[in-house]
Amino acid sequence: MAESIKQFTKKFGLPRLIITAFFMLLCVTAVLMGLPFGSMVSDVIRRFGMFGVLVLAMVPAIQSGIGPNFALPLGVLCGLFGGILSMELGFGGGMGFWSSIIISLPFAIVVGWGYGIMLNKIKGSEMLVATYMGFSATAFMCIMWVALPFKHPEMVWPIGKGLRVTVSLDSTFGQILNDFAAFKIGHIKIPTGLLIFFLGSCLVVWLFTRSKMGIAMRAVGDNPKFATASGMNVDNSRIIGTILSTVIGAIGIIVYAQSFGFYQLYMAPQYMAFGAVAAILIGGASARKAKISHVILGVFLFQGMLTVALPVANGLIPEGNLSEVLRVIVQNGIILYALTQVGGGE
């Protein structure tokens, strides 16, 4: 019996098992407390769709061998720059959303390519360098958000220079995916467009991993020495994975922002990677293995737990900030656990 439990725990994953049990406990507690469960389910579904693409950016990074992409802010900043430029050019509605993505792509590709070249020079220290690369890029863009000559009245400060910390998307494409073909089942709102976009993105990435280039990239991530002996270009495959991760991150922040209804600039992107890394690790990924199923399950568990924990924690301890403390503990604890499972000495 003990052996069976041990095998099940090893197969299912200890973090996933703990978070699943805790999430179920939170749901039961919410029902017993009489909280509006329908609205909480709606929030879980919405956050599942809006955060999913950012977590999806981890898949090509892990599969190509660079590990969890803690430099996700690079892609996020490219997406924010593309979105801000789209607003400056006067695009709105569906055109504003798609133009934001299209404009951000060249920046994300160039940044991902340069970052991939850098990672090839510091093999073995990718996660450490990635973290500080994300911090440095965020700080650099704080200067650029002030210095760049944007003039759109909804974006700049009243003095006429420098972008605001929060840029509203109400007049452009805020909620455009959430409202597309949305419907209600009782008190639960289903954001059809948002879910279609996220699941469609998952399908595209899954198809890429089954292509010739994707298989080569996965082979490099699984065993670089074997890939080299087989005649594969390890460095190029790592660069491709980095570019894809950066591009998906740029698209992901645009999806994320339209769901919230605003862009947040300056220091806001700095810690975006940590939640995304924690989510895919909760889903069952490791620092060396990742699949689309890990993304879907991880996003649902991570965002579901955070969404339900907030009203439950406020109901139990109204004076404190227990839900935020819980988020930090789970997010960083999961990342720490995953890093302890990475073998060294190769």
Q: Which ranges hold each PLM region?
A:
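Central hydrophobic cores of alpha-helical transmembrane segments
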Residues: G75-G79, A130-S136, S293-M305
